[in-house]
Amino acid sequence: MTAKIGVITFPGTLDDVDAQRAVRLAGAEAVSLWHADTDLKGVDAVVVPGGFSYGDYLRSGAISALAPVMQSVVDRARQGMPTLGICNGFQILTEAGLLEGALTRNKGLHFHCVDTHLEVVNNNTAWTTEFEAGDKIFVPAKHGEGRFQAAPETIDKLEGEGQVVFRYTDNFNGSLNDIAGITNETGRIVGLMPHPEHAIETLTGPSTDGLGLFVSAINAITATV
């Protein structure tokens, strides 16, 4: 069986093609999903990619979270479908209530476009089993609203229950506790601000470290079949 991973396109999405390529290089079939779709076309997992969906009006991800396709994603994700939000996709997952916290303007109010080392904190999620805890992965980041914020009790919960997945080693955006990515209680839903789909080939990225997220998802899918 070949795993099918859907990649959503909203108006303003930028990185859907890159995410689809990452899915294919990892060994799965990439399935295009449009923001107005309600049928997820039989996919086994979903990637919500980066960009500036709906121009980031209201708040980043706020309008996209209400799109028809996201209503279907929310239903399936709550049933255990592996779901990954990257950058704007992470913002969308928080707005949709699938992940806790919020992403706000970077410290210093600047847009940052950098390659960054992330520490893998939790390698037991559907998207991180190809890594070891403590691994450092080198991936691009590009965002203006990536500063992870949450109430103190939420931070305590995320830390105490192992829901922090990635930490910045350079924390250029001011995220609380250096948090770059988190998961939900089941480990099936993951969001991160940096871009693993831009680190899959040495020709175009700073490393191939990002491919591990997509291979991990394929393994999670096949393990449940």
From Swiss-Prot:
The keyword Ligase applies. It holds the Pfam family GATase_5. It is found in: Cytoplasm. GO terms for cellular component: cytoplasm. It catalyses: N(2)-formyl-N(1)-(5-phospho-beta-D-ribosyl)glycinamide + L-glutamine + ATP + H2O = 2-formamido-N(1)-(5-O-phospho-beta-D-ribosyl)acetamidine + L-glutamate + ADP + phosphate + H(+); L-glutamine + H2O = L-glutamate + NH4(+). Pathway: Purine metabolism; IMP biosynthesis via de novo pathway; 5-amino-1-(5-phospho-D-ribosyl)imidazole from N(2)-formyl-N(1)-(5-phospho-D-ribosyl)glycinamide: step 1/2. Part of the phosphoribosylformylglycinamidine synthase complex involved in the purines biosynthetic pathway. Catalyzes the ATP-dependent conversion of formylglycinamide ribonucleotide (FGAR) and glutamine to yield formylglycinamidine ribonucleotide (FGAM) and glutamate. The FGAM synthase complex is composed of three subunits. PurQ produces an ammonia molecule by converting glutamine to glutamate. PurL transfers the ammonia molecule to FGAR to form FGAM in an ATP-dependent manner. This is Phosphoribosylformylglycinamidine synthase subunit PurQ.
